[in-house]
């Protein structure tokens, strides 16, 4: 397919979906699509939400991979230990259950990590005076020492990934995402036995959720047909 034919086909497809389309709006849309094609090796996700989620997810996976590389300087130290130590350090003295919830960890896995940190002398534990059934944990001097060492190591992946991005651009992204992070921290800490559909219904309402899912099915069918046509 020639470049001009490709552009005309894209314009026709765009105008069918957007009756009052302008050339400027189309150009912005087309450039965004082409950019996403390059980003994901030609297999562009069917909508901007999925593109957004995929990009953030891949960046998170890359950060994890680089972080594990950096921690090779501390043989035996697990990345999950850092998350727990960091949480306890910033929350001061805190209940075990709060640490586990904050890190979205299964109860048994979280208890296992906390026990390892305690056995290594990185955290101390005492009974909560307000609730004898609960345990409070805090970071020890030994824990602080190892935590500050890990801070230095884990700055390397951050530097590698994000140093080239302009500070103002990074601040814009932080401003956009911080409320979402806070909102879902609260949701996940109280989720208990709810399903993802329960959470969607509570957040969007059942009617809106059904309409979105129906539109999503149509979008996916269109996207899949387009993908097969381009093969």
Predicted regions and their residues:
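N-terminal leader segment of winged-helix/HTH proteins
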Residues: 1-74
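N-terminal helix-turn-helix DNA-binding core of bacterial DNA-binding proteins
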Residues: 68-105, 109
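Charged, amphipathic alpha-helical coiled-coil/dimerization segments
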Residues: 116-171
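Flexible interhelical turns and helix-capping residues at alpha-helix boundaries
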Residues: 60, 75, 92, 103, ...
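A structural signal for well-ordered alpha-helices, especially hydrophobic packing surfaces
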Residues: 60, 147, 181-184
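Terminal interaction helix/tail motif
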Residues: 152-229
